[in-house]
């Protein structure tokens, strides 16, 4: 099992320094999405006092030519704080700061999908859209081999691992528990965790979150997971099909509701939304992974609890459908629906924006509508 060199350093020595007092100063770790649309970057600055809100945080900049976001001749990019959380690694009063990225001309960077998503969310705020996203991921060694798998073969077939207990069924629970507690400390709206169908595959759920909070909380939860894994010396991958063959892929099932859907006879509005989604399948497939559907093509095969990428389907309690209505929702005739198409490496801002555009703004066609300011 290959682990990183850093994980073999003596953590007790580090703790000697981390327990030193820091006076009135505060360390703020600025986090942003890089030019891949999947990778996260971070750097830290010192503040003179503890910020009470995101509006007290200064803007910053970075070298975009080193993050696939600009040319070297004009490489300064702006970091504009968007959301602030407690820092579970350095602890209070230190902060994690999730940022939007803007180019030299103050236009949003290509992978800053939060900017437009926020505008779209503000247009429908009176409908109180709630989201919950189920983030699946796979633990890997630094050699790219799944954590806990035999070095020269495969574990036993899928079956005993989903929500499994025991050393031969659950691979890497220490990481899952550390991540869970770190998210709770940070103020992330983490709803739960479970072991998934493939060994070394896990899931955590974020939500319910209203509007733009969904993307902020999921991205920072991903960042915390990467940092926890860094300490343990392993890798968390959000690849939607990390192991080819008869193994489950990794998705980011997205649960969605509005105030009307959650109230009596809300099932009517759920069914209306599903009808709208059925007529815009390809638009959503393009929005549901960072490569415009190419990543999901490896996962959405119609097998391993997925729908086929080329077909739209919906059903009650059907995990082989594009859209699943939970059985309890069908019985109570109100609640939410689950879009099972987003890939594990999706951008939650892209996914939630697409759902709002189609279900609430009644957009049709293969391209998003351009609204005036």
UniProtKB/Swiss-Prot annotation:
Gene3D superfamilies: Glutamine synthetase, N-terminal domain (3.10.20.70), Glutamine synthetase/guanido kinase, catalytic domain (3.30.590.10). The modification Phosphotyrosine is found at residue 104. Residues 2-25 are annotated as: Required for glutamine-induced ubiquitination by CRL4(CRBN) and proteasomal degradation. Its main location: cytoplasm. Mn(2+) 2 binds at residues 136, 196, 203. Residues 24-106 form the GS beta-grasp domain. One of its GO terms (molecular function) is ATP binding. It is a lipid-anchor. Residues 113-373 form the GS catalytic domain. Its cofactor is Mg(2+); Mn(2+). The keyword Magnesium applies. Its EC number is 6.3.1.2, 2.3.1.225. The modification N6-acetyllysine is found at residues 11, 14. It is found in: Cytoplasm, Cytosol; Microsome; Mitochondrion; Cell membrane. The modification N-acetylalanine is found at residue 2. Mn(2+) 1 binds at residues 134, 253, 338. Palmitoylated; undergoes autopalmitoylation. The modification Phosphoserine is found at residue 343. It catalyses: L-glutamate + NH4(+) + ATP = L-glutamine + ADP + phosphate + H(+); L-cysteinyl-[protein] + hexadecanoyl-CoA = S-hexadecanoyl-L-cysteinyl-[protein] + CoA. Keywords: Acetylation, Angiogenesis, ATP-binding, Cell membrane, Cytoplasm, Endoplasmic reticulum, Ligase, Lipoprotein, Magnesium, Manganese, Membrane, Metal-binding, Microsome, Mitochondrion, Nucleotide-binding, Palmitate, Phosphoprotein, Transferase, Ubl conjugation. Glutamine synthetase that catalyzes the ATP-dependent conversion of glutamate and ammonia to glutamine. Its role depends on tissue localization: in the brain, it regulates the levels of toxic ammonia and converts neurotoxic glutamate to harmless glutamine, whereas in the liver, it is one of the enzymes responsible for the removal of ammonia. Belongs to the glutamine synthetase family. This is Glutamine synthetase.
């Amino acid at each position: 099992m290959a682990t990183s060199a850093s994980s073999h350093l003596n953590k007790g020595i580090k703790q000697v320094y981390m327990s030193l007092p820091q006076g009135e100063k505060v360390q703020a770790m600025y986090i942003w999405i890089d030019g891949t649309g999947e990778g996260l970057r971070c750097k830290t600055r010192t503040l003179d006092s503890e910020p009470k809100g995101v509006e007290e945080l200064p803007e910053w900049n970075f070298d975009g030519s080193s993050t696939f976001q600009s040319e070297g001749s004009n490489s300064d990019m702006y970091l504009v704080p968007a959301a602030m959380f407690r820092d579970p690694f350095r602890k209070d009063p230190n902060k994690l700061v999730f940022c939007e990225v803007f180019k030299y001309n103050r236009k949003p960077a290509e992978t800053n999908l939060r900017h437009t998503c926020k505008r779209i969310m503000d247009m429908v705020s009176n409908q109180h859209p709630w989201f919950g996203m189920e983030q699946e991921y796979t633990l890997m060694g630094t050699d790219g081999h799944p954590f806990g798998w035999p070095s020269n073969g495969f574990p036993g077939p899928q079956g005993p691992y989903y929500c499994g207990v025991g050393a031969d069924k659950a691979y890497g629970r220490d990481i899952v528990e550390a991540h869970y507690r770190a998210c709770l400390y940070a103020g992330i709206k983490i709803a739960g965790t479970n072991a998934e169908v493939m060994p070394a595959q896990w899931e955590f759920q974020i939500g319910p979150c209203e509007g733009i909070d969904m993307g902020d909380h999921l991205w920072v939860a991903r960042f915390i997971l990467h940092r926890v894994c860094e300490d343990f010396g392993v890798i968390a991958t959000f690849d939607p099909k990390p192991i080819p063959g008869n193994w489950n892929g990794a998705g980011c099932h997205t649960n969605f509701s509005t105030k009307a859907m959650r109230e009596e006879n809300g099932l009517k509005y759920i069914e209306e939304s599903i009808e709208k989604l059925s007529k815009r399948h390809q638009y959503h497939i393009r929005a549901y992974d960072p490569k415009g559907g190419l990543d999901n093509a490896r996962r959405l095969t119609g097998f391993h609890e997925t729908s086929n990428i080329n077909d739209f389907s919906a059903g009650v309690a059907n995990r082989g459908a594009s859209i699943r209505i939970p059985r309890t929702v069908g019985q109570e005739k109100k609640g939410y629906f689950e879009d099972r198409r987003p890939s594990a490496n999706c951008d939650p801002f892209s996914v939630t924006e697409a759902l709002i555009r189609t279900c609430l703004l009644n957009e049709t066609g293969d391209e998003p509508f351009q609204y005036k300011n």
